[in-house]
Amino acid sequence: DQLDTPYRPGGWTVRQLVHHCADSHMNAFIRFKLALTEKNPTVKPYDEAVWADLPDANLPIESSLATLNAIHLKWGVLLDSMKEEDFKRTYFHPEKKRSQGLEEVTFLYAWHSQHHLAHVQHLVLRENWSFGK
């Protein structure tokens, strides 16, 4: 199955990549809300590689695509409502040993989706996959 093809040698499969995006964006959205409601809260890191090996990483990707759609809808509502000063709010990331502002986080997660989409697009081209109409 194409979804179980690693996007690069030794890398995650397309399926794991989609589930990773949902996991990552769920965590980011919660961190975002914490920063909007608390003063520089310390967020909880997680081991994304271990999460990618949990049993839910074998589910059909539709579950994570639906999760991403829902999170992005909610996140969009928050972003649309934010004032300039809200983007200066921060959270502390213990693995990075620094605070991250919501403006930086917004750009980071917009990039994150595009970055992983590019992995899949390159795989499709490299493998010369075609999709019926």
Please describe what each predicted stretch is.
Residues 4-49, 73-76, 90-133:
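Short, contiguous alpha-helical
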Residues 31, 51-89, 109:
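Acidic/histidine-rich alpha-helical segments that form the ligand environment
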